[in-house]
Amino acid sequence: MTTRATFAAFLTSLKKNLIIMKKRHLLLIALPLLFSAGARAQSDSEQPYVSKKFTSPSLKELVVETSGGSIAVTGGQSDGFKVDMFVKPNNWNGKDELSKDEIEDRLEDYDILIGTEGNRVVATAKRKAGTKWDNKKSISIGFKVYAPRNVATNLKTSGGSIKIASLTGEQNFQTSGGSLKVEDLNGMIHGRTSGGSIDVANCSNEIDLETSGGSIKAAGLKGKIELNTSGGSITLNSINGDVVAHTSGGSVKGDDISGTLDTGTSGGSVRLANVSGSIKASTSAGSVEVELTKLGKYVDISSSAGSVRVTMPMDAGMDLNLKGNKVSIPLKNFDGRVEKEYVRGKMNGGGIPVTLSASSGSVYVN
């Protein structure tokens, strides 16, 4: 069959599968028209299979959804939106790359939408209802989007990672099977993953990130920050704001933290250095070491299965409540009660409540 005949047949096939959504004014990108510029086989060279641009200044939102691939969004572009679609074979089907014909055949099982809806850019790839799953023919459809800085997003994938960077506005993103990499965002930031780690850096305003299956690394954050994981460690560096960071399955480490910190773990130790402000820290399965450079409104540190060691300024007025198998603290200008296992009273006239507790270990204050 000639190339012209093959292309005509493919056009006819695609027309049968296009979804017409006039009421929603969704601009559907007829894939054959894009292919006419030169459809290509996909490999690790990372050339997009489909690429489309949208330049209207009224476009302020981005919606991306795919069931089997990764999503990457980068803001800061000056010439509107560019959407690239990538098609790859899944790792378990024994192929590293697909030919043009193979891609066209496998895309028959998907509804692909790339276009606009009101003030939104929409890019989705969904399996058609009723299609049978075939591991040998399964593919991963991913999207890379380049967007202006001031754009709100709603991103969702069930089978890949999400990378999002250089945006201002409300950002919502979730994946069931990959990691989150978040950088240079300002606004309401809400991200979830059920199967990967989180790496977040240089973000501000309101940050809410959670994973059920990986570690969290956070650096250069400012604002109201909430980080939670059920299955990994937490590392905090250069954080400023109201911070909540908890894990059920790993350690907590941090350096250069200011503001208010509420952190804890059920499965590891806590190590914090250069902390300035109010702190609540706890562990059920390890020791706690904290270096405070400046006291805030309170200090509340506890361990159920290890020792507590705190280095902090001793010249402020404090109300001390320390208890453990052994308590060691240099006391000056103190009025209260001192025993081997506890210290209670006022230091320097009283003031900031300082509560240190080790149920199965000692408490040391330097």
Locate predicted features.
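Intrinsically disordered, low-complexity terminal regions
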Residues: 2-366
